[in-house]
């Protein structure tokens, strides 16, 4: 079985459009086979965005890690006027994100990166709905690795379900970050982590 965090060049392409509404704004995104949550914006991403936007409304420099087809970055640009770099290990996801950037006349940037391998900048916020199925080592690389790409008072925002180890992962990050649970609904936990 193929996962959305791998690249399968031979996977058939069936690009389609999905609609998403948040804060009375409507978005239409291109999606395709082989990307995360291709049929609709998943609940975790939706809750992460709503919680973030309830807490932060200013224009910031943001990195969206594991951007999928670009939902988080494009919504944040539209709602907060933030400048967002969007990265993914899945080349099809990066291609779709670039299509959605063009469609929405966005100034955001999307590029391939294995975790932070191609990231050269620092950010006010790093935000992610991380790929849980990559395993603990890669997941911790994404979450702990964010620290060196955060500005001095930067924040890492992420979502993990409680039954997927959200609280266990939080404990593993407590040497690196001061972490606060900003919201919890339907088993999903929204975390905001600030560097110690």
What is the meaning of each model-derived region?
Residues 44-128:
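Conserved SAM/SAH cofactor-binding pocket of Class I
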Residues 88-92, 138, 161:
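Short beta->alpha hinge that forms the Motif I/post-I loop of the SAM-binding pocket
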Residues 32-50:
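Conserved SAM-binding loop and adjacent beta-strand
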Residues 153-161:
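Conserved beta-strand signature within the Rossmann-like core of class I S-adenosyl-L-methionine
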